[in-house]
């Protein structure tokens, strides 16, 4: 295969659609570094694996020698992206946007090569725009064209309000491509309309229209809905290593292959096919593949040592292999006179309610430091430190404290083998 053919094979991996493919091939053959753009509105301070689908593709372009522009939409974030919404999104304040954006650089450079990345803010050009300039921009598209967007069309048909500023969002995102002279813009499949807007506006302004590359939306831990912090089905890239491992081990086998395609750098497309065949023939336990993926993710966001330690901690409890001293110790604040076991099970997040905790105790599914217990009144005082389990699937290593500095253990950190 030629160099260009190899590049295209890497670029195509996991991609949903490339428009126009022949233009991409022609620009790659030119031999010049392309400008690859992807925009992120800072609506939240933390990024999750769903965001890294685009970051990973950007990194692949960097590995091929191209220049990446990581665009922080501090201006567009104050408008609110209407994509996929059946109601108007609440705009963020300037303070919220800047606070969220301040956390992005440290996170994105866990994936991107800093030396081949421009970090830009779209307020650079929009804050210089006059009202006349904005009206001229708005004049470049029709309301009828905007209503071709699926979400706008549905809201219009159901008589849900569409606010005028929402029509401006695709135009403003498209104008970013003019300001940055983008060769390629990346986005989720839900962003296709906005990405094509950039292409149309570039052509209108005499620039070569950008190639549009859409990536699938990553399904979350449930394997159904797209990964979202609001749905709780996400893995944040700043989460502790043990949490990344345990959440990755929870995903279904079918979802595992999807994640490998979109998230893995180390498992090639060809190897993924071979692994899938081995699993189908029962020659390989899918758990081993998930462990490999989990190791890669933790290594990317932390380092190899953190990955080894987290996996050893997970194996110590779930498979009985290794040393459970490697598990992180979670502080749980309790009253000075202590807490009963039922309350501790709910307080730790192992059980959703006292009644469910009682049911598990009656089933003799609860263990403390490996010993089965069924006494709901068993009392624990501050200073207790140990491993509490419900079955083999859910467990937490705790230290009971009364300090005001302690933090209750969040549910997302529970280990669940299911």
Swiss-Prot record:
CDD domains: S4, TyrRS_core. SMART domains: S4. GO terms for cellular component: cytosol. It catalyses: tRNA(Tyr) + L-tyrosine + ATP = L-tyrosyl-tRNA(Tyr) + AMP + diphosphate + H(+). InterPro entries: aa-tRNA-synth_I_CS, aa-tRNA-synth_Ic, Rossmann-like_a/b/a_fold, S4_RNA-bd, S4_RNA-bd_sf, Tyr-tRNA-ligase, Tyr-tRNA-ligase_bac-type, Tyr-tRNA-ligase_bac_2. A motif ('HIGH' region) lies at residues 42-51. PANTHER family: TYROSINE--TRNA LIGASE, TYROSYL-TRNA SYNTHETASE. Catalyzes the attachment of tyrosine to tRNA(Tyr) in a two-step reaction: tyrosine is first activated by ATP to form Tyr-AMP and then transferred to the acceptor end of tRNA(Tyr). Homodimer. Belongs to the class-I aminoacyl-tRNA synthetase family. TyrS type 2 subfamily. This is Tyrosine--tRNA ligase. It comes from Xylella fastidiosa (strain Temecula1 / ATCC 700964). The gene is tyrS.
